[in-house]
């Protein structure tokens, strides 16, 4: 499962692929993919990093592990492939976006448009066994994605980290550089969205920060497919 990242993440993350934890993760993944149905497809595991280069990252939206249903996960946190029903948390994200900007809720959950504008849609665990949430937790991915966060933390150019829920907020300890910005609330899940996600205005907060930095704002509107 070693991967040659074709953009500037390549040299930055190359040392990780040689570390003992990743070698063990690699053995585990080869076995998992050969015996079980695992998401996303092997070639899509690193999609978040492929779509959003290190230099171009403006925003990080941190997720947990991939969706574990058929045809959902494709390597971007919260995003699903075209033609698949929009999951409940993403639907709540769209509702908040509608309330902030008046955008119609789209007929899909395909967030590539965000990724292409510099929104790194990163899960902390990059693979999952079909139908078994968190089945690849604690196998090594957390070391790898912590390193991604640490590398962004080392950057002088500010990054806006969106941390929804306790799992994402646990990564705050990795964000020590005062150049960066943190936007946090409860998770958009139906279990918690009404306890402070709705009305938190994360999207306009991001764009206010970007505008103040002289950066191009994110066009958050997802088109119908």
UniProtKB/Swiss-Prot annotation:
Swiss-Prot/TrEMBL GO biological process terms: base-excision repair, AP site formation via deaminated base removal
Subcellular locations according to the entry: Cytoplasm
Active-site feature positions: 65 (proton acceptor)
Enzyme class at the top of the EC tree: hydrolase
Gene3D superfamilies linked: Uracil-DNA glycosylase-like domain (3.40.470.10)
Keyword DNA repair: yes
Entries under PROSITE patterns matching the protein: U_DNA_GLYCOSYLASE
Catalytic activity annotation: Hydrolyzes single-stranded DNA or mismatched double-stranded DNA and polynucleotides, releasing free uracil
Coiled-coil annotated spans: none
This protein's UniProt keywords: Cytoplasm, DNA damage, DNA repair, Hydrolase
SUPFAM superfamilies, alphabetized: Uracil-DNA glycosylase-like
Assigned protein family: Belongs to the uracil-DNA glycosylase (UDG) superfamily. UNG family.
Protein name, UniProt field: Uracil-DNA glycosylase
UniProt organism field: Bacillus cereus (strain AH820)
């Amino acid at each position: 499962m070693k991967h040659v990242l074709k953009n500037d993440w390549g040299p930055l993350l190359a040392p990780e692929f040689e570390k003992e934890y990743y070698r063990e993760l690699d053995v585990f993944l080869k076995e998992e993919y050969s015996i079980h149905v695992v998401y996303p497809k092997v070639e899509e595991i690193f999609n978040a990093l492929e779509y959003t280069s290190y230099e171009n990252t403006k925003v990080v939206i941190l997720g947990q592990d991939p969706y574990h249903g058929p045809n959902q996960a494709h390597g971007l946190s919260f995003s699903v492939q075209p033609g698949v029903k929009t999951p409940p948390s993403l639907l709540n994200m769209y509702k908040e976006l509608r309330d902030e900007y008046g955008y119609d809720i789209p007929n899909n959950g395909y967030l590539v448009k965000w990724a292409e504008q510099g929104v790194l849609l990163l899960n902390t665990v990059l693979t999952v066994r079909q139908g078994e949430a968190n089945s690849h937790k604690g196998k090594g991915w957390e070391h790898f994605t912590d390193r991604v966060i640490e590398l962004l933390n080392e950057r002088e150019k500010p990054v806006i980290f969106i941390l929804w829920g306790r799992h994402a907020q646990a990564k705050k300890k990795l964000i020590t550089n005062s150049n960066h910005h943190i936007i946090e609330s409860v998770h958009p899940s139906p279990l918690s969205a009404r306890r402070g996600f709705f009305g938190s205005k994360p999207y306009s907060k991001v764009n206010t920060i970007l505008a103040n930095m002289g950066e191009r704002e994110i066009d958050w509107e997802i088109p119908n497919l």
